[in-house]
């Protein structure tokens, strides 16, 4: 049986890594070893940050809701508790959108929460 040299396979493997590293800074898109290391790190960052993104958006929504709630004389926790007592099920994403784009609608929800808290 003839000896098989791995040139084609090796070139394909290196080319695949360098293609993934396209646009990276400095030697990280030219040299195979540094490109491979950076691609591995990039996969790690992407995996980690897909999870982090959910936390970051929730924090942003809570911050926006809290700011709008305080303009209506409530804290964030009081608003959420009042909405729960009033059987108003609006998620944080929608509440934050209302707080930014529809102040009157948010005020109506805040007033409903205030009424339930007063009772």
From Swiss-Prot:
GO terms (BP aspect): ribosomal large subunit assembly; translation
Keywords assigned by UniProt, alphabetized: Ribonucleoprotein, Ribosomal protein, RNA-binding, rRNA-binding
Coiled-coil ranges from the UniProt annotation: none
Superkingdom, natural source: Bacteria
PROSITE patterns xref list: RIBOSOMAL_L20 (PS00937)
UniProt entry tagged with the keyword Thylakoid: no
GO CC annotation terms, alphabetical: ribonucleoprotein complex; ribosome
InterPro entries (UniProt xref): Ribosomal_bL20 (IPR005813), RIBOSOMAL_L20_CS (IPR049946), Ribosomal_protein_bL20_C (IPR035566)
One Pfam family hit: Ribosomal_L20
GO MF annotation: an example: rRNA binding
Keyword Ribosomal protein: yes
Family note: Belongs to the bacterial ribosomal protein bL20 family.
Role noted for this protein: Binds directly to 23S ribosomal RNA and is necessary for the in vitro assembly process of the 50S ribosomal subunit. It is not involved in the protein synthesizing functions of that subunit.
PANTHER family, sorted: 39S RIBOSOMAL PROTEIN L20 (PTHR10986)
Name of the protein: Large ribosomal subunit protein bL20
Organism: Streptococcus uberis (strain ATCC BAA-854 / 0140J)
């Amino acid at each position: 049986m003839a000896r098989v040299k791995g040139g084609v396979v090796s070139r394909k493997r290196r080319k695949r890594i360098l293609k993934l590293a396209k646009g990276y800074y400095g030697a990280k898109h030219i040299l195979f070893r540094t490109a491979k290391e950076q691609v591995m790190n990039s996969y790690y960052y992407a995996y980690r940050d897909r999870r982090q993104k959910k936390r970051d958006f929730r924090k942003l929504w809570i911050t926006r809701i809290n700011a709008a709630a305080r303009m209506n004389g409530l804290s964030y926790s009081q608003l959420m508790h009042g909405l729960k007592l009033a059987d108003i099920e609006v998620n944080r994403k929608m509440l934050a959108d209302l707080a930014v784009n529809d102040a009157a609608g948010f005020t109506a929800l805040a007033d409903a929460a205030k009424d339930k808290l007063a009772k």
